[in-house]
């Protein structure tokens, strides 16, 4: 239970007596900022009172008097402002008792929820192309969400919906044939370069375009030679991508790959089903679904093509089969898509068709967690000087290279092995955390000097904050694993730190509600700052009172464990030295 949920439960209990029924969201309970004296504030009473034609102050006073009547031990003081805000001060004794429980818990007192089957569709790069910087956000936002959901106890099905089918394979096969490149030579080729050359031919040569389309149809009809080439290209790409996932500390593996080709055998049935249900209509030889909720430029219902005149299927057909499979076979309770905001309208159309066809039941939650772009200093999509997408492996290597220089400057006594280890943990952590710390919905500017700094809300700062706490125990020669006891709060800063530590579960749930890992990043940064103030003002080394020292060590231990767990569930590694 979180403090917010307990307050909500108590207020709802009071209001239910006078037949007022509200939701947790209606109460609008907020945490204090560092400058405020209260710990929590209930803001929703004003709106509630206005809706009921009651005086907000009078209603707030009624709630407070009845909360006191129930004598809940967690409250030190509850007050009402003249406007109707309820200010809550948490009881120190209650906080001490609850934090002591957290220290004794491997999960920091956070209980697992009733599990749901949740599919997360993320990363999903195209085969025969190198992963570029544009894949970074989907990959690490999706992975962080998967980790958080698993930590809370949900059954998470990661799906890497790779683009292993479609026109680009027809282009590549046509190019290989045109240039007499044999099957055995494919492994020696740069697939990215091969794709780019094939794309130029496709755009400029109508005859080549025709051959491409013929090979696409051959692939769909399972032509043996085309399938053999296709498998070779897919395998080579997956091997390269898996190296990137491993370096990024991303939990996607080969077993999570369910590419577009997986649905091939289902596509004819999808077309037939939509025809039978009179959802798809034939138009000039193609099959189209017209959607009244979506309008084209002329104001007429938008048409979504699901099968072309030549019999070829489209991405729309694949995505419909994919949705049907996930809902009916995998029996998902929720499906979360981490795909580009530019796909928003298209995904809405696919969902609308799937609902019309009855593939999605009303109790399934489907959410498009769109995200903004990574931009360069000129606020345009982050790319090379020539305008090409930056290759993700190059970006990772550059981060490690820069981190290596920083680690070397900080500690010239590091061995080569230590230097390699640190540069990878710091560099990878830095680019991931910089992305995760930004609001998912906004674009952000990629700046190396901000990514790898030890000041502010960055991975290096967080990693250093963790090391700093470890050094306290090392200096005092005390084992963090063996330290135990009851927390006693004697100073105001200890109390502030304790409240912040207790909010960890609250933060995780809020982050998940909005699919917003930046909420966790912000919390961890604020926790580190409060601990820094606590460390400066509440002496650990100089304290002559052994009980006070032990208590402060317990708070330090809980802070370290919270930082480590918080970073872990968003995919950032901690380090023990620097």
Curated annotation (Swiss-Prot):
Transmembrane segments: none annotated. One of its GO terms (cellular component) is cytoplasm. PROSITE patterns: AA_TRNA_LIGASE_I. It comes from the Bacteria. It catalyses: tRNA(Arg) + L-arginine + ATP = L-arginyl-tRNA(Arg) + AMP + diphosphate. InterPro entries: aa-tRNA-synth_I_CS (IPR001412), Arg-tRNA-ligase (IPR001278), Arg-tRNA-synth_N (IPR005148), Arg-tRNA-synth_N_sf (IPR036695), ArgRS_core (IPR035684), DALR_anticod-bd (IPR008909), Rossmann-like_a/b/a_fold (IPR014729), tRNAsynth_Ia_anticodon-bd (IPR009080). Its EC number is 6.1.1.19. Keywords: Aminoacyl-tRNA synthetase, ATP-binding, Cytoplasm, Ligase, Nucleotide-binding, Protein biosynthesis. One of its GO terms (molecular function) is arginine-tRNA ligase activity. A motif ('HIGH' region) lies at residues 125-135. The keyword Signal does not apply. The keyword Chaperone does not apply. One of its GO terms (biological process) is arginyl-tRNA aminoacylation. It is found in: Cytoplasm. It is an enzyme of class 6 (ligase). Monomer. Belongs to the class-I aminoacyl-tRNA synthetase family. This is Arginine--tRNA ligase. It comes from Buchnera aphidicola subsp. Baizongia pistaciae (strain Bp). The lineage of its organism: Bacteria, Pseudomonadati, Pseudomonadota, Gammaproteobacteria, Enterobacterales.
């Amino acid at each position: 239970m979180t403090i917010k949920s307990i307050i909500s439960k108590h207020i709802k209990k009071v209001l239910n007596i006078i037949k007022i029924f509200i939701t947790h969201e209606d109460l609008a309970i907020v945490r204090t900022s560092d400058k405020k004296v209260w710990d929590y504030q209930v803001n929703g009473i004003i709106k509630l009172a206005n809706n009921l034609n009651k005086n907000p102050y009078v209603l707030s006073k009624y709630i407070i008097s009845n909360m006191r009547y129930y004598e809940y031990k967690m409250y030190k003081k509850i007050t009402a402002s003249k406007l109707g805000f309820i200010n809550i001060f948490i009881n120190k004794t209650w906080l001490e008792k609850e934090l002591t429980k957290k220290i004794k818990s491997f999960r920091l007192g956070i209980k697992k929820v009733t599990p749901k089957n949740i599919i997360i569709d993320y990363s999903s790069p195209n085969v025969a192309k190198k992963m570029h910087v544009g894949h970074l956000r989907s990959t690490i936002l999706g992975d962080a969400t998967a980790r958080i959901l698993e930590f809370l106890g949900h059954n998470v099905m990661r799906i890497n919906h790779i683009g292993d089918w479609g026109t680009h394979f027809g282009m590549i096969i046509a190019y290989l044939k045109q240039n007499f490149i044999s099957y055995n030579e494919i492994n020696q080729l740069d697939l990215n370069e091969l794709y780019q050359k094939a794309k130029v031919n496709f755009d400029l040569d109508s005859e080549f375009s025709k051959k491409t389309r013929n090979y696409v149809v051959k692939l769909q009809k399972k032509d043996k030679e085309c399938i053999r080439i296709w498998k070779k290209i897919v395998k080579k790409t997956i091997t390269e991508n898996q190296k990137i996932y491993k370096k990024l500390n991303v939990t996607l593996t080969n077993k999570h790959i369910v590419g577009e080709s997986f649905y091939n055998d289902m596509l004819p049935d999808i077309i037939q089903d939509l025809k039978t249900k009179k959802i798809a209509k034939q138009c000039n030889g193609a099959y189209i679904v017209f959607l009244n909720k979506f309008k084209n430029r002329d104001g007429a219902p938008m048409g979504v093509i699901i099968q072309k005149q030549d019999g070829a299927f489209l991405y729309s057909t694949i995505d419909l089969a994919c949705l049907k499979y996930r809902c009916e076979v995998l029996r998902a309770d929720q499906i979360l898509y981490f795909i580009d905001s530019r796909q928003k309208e298209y995904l809405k159309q696919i969902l609308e068709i799937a609902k019309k066809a009855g593939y999605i039941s009303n109790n399934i939650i489907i959410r498009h967690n769109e995200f903004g772009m990574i931009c360069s200093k000129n606020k345009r999509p982050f790319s090379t000087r020539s305008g090409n997408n930056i290759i993700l492996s190059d970006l990772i290597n550059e981060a490690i290279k820069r981190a290596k220089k920083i680690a070397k400057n900080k500690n010239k006594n590091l061995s080569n092995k230590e230097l390699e280890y640190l540069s990878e943990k710091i560099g990878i952590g830095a680019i991931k955390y910089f992305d995760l710390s930004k609001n998912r919905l906004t674009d952000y500017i990629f700046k190396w000097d901000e990514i790898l700094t030890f000041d502010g809300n960055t991975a290096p700062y967080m990693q250093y904050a963790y090391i700093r706490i470890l050094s306290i125990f090392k200096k005092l020669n005390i084992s963090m694993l063996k330290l135990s006891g009851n927390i006693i709060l004697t100073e105001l800063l200890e109390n502030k730190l304790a409240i912040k530590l207790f909010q960890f579960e609250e933060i995780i749930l809020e982050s998940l509600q909005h699919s917003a890992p930046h909420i966790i990043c912000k919390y961890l940064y604020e926790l580190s700052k409060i601990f820094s103030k606590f460390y400066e003002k509440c002496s650990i080394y100089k304290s002559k009172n052994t009980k006070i020292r032990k208590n402060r060590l317990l708070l330090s231990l809980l802070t370290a464990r919270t930082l480590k767990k918080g970073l872990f569930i968003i995919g950032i590694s901690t380090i023990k030295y620097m």
